[in-house]
Design a protein with these regions (language model features):
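N-terminal topogenic membrane-targeting module
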Residues: 21-91, 98-103
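General structural signal for secondary-structure boundaries
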Residues: 2-3, 33, 51, 113-119
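Cytosol-/stroma-facing membrane-proximal "stalk/adaptor" domains immediately downstream
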Residues: 89-162
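N-terminal signal-anchor transmembrane alpha helix of single-pass membrane proteins
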Residues: 1-34
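Intrinsic low-complexity, intrinsically disordered segments enriched in polar/basic residues
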Residues: 5-6, 40-41, 150
Length: 162
């Protein structure tokens, strides 16, 4: 009797978790069939493209996953920006390579089912600001590590402020 109650309780809890999540995924599918990810976030992607890729980025959509989109540029091959939309949340991932060291930065934005133009601009600007800081830190750290690994007189007197 006790095992049956525990089993039913576990099934009930799993249903409470699984059913709303599944409904959100169905909403995503319906929403993205009417309004693909590149159209839904057109302003946001445009601002990121203009500032981070000098307006030369190209969008890549995936037939097998309409929730995923990449933004990259031939001019800046060391940078890839991925967008993943799921359950009303947008995750933007920056992949940036500098001197063979990769920076991966991920930021999630929630509650974006009904997104205004102003919200898209704000999200894009927030992401760009954070990424610019992360890229500068990465370049400084990788550049400093690269210089500090060199031997001989070239490294004498080198400090983090240089």
């Amino acid at each position: 009797m006790t095992i049956t109650l525990i089993f039913l309780l576990v099934i009930f809890v799993l249903a409470l978790i699984f059913v709303p999540f599944t409904r959100q995924l169905v909403k995503d599918k319906e929403e993205l069939s009417r309004n693909p990810i590149n159209k839904k976030f057109e302003i946001l992607v445009g601002v990121i493209n203009d500032i981070m890729l000098d307006g030369k980025g190209e969008i890549t959509l995936f037939d097998d996953d309409p929730r995923l989109m990449n933004l990259m540029s031939e001019d800046k091959r060391n940078m890839l920006i991925q967008f993943h939309y799921s359950t009303g949340n947008l995750t933007i991932i920056l992949n940036y390579k500098f001197l063979q060291k990769e920076l991966v930065y991920k930021k999630q934005f929630s509650g974006l089912r009904n997104l205004s133009v102003f919200m898209q601009r704000d999200i894009a600007n927030e992401f760009i600001e954070i990424c610019n800081k992360k890229i500068a830190e990465h370049q400084q750290n990788v550049g400093y590590m690269d210089m500090s690994s060199m031997s001989g007189a070239h490294c004498q007197g080198l400090s983090e402020s240089d």
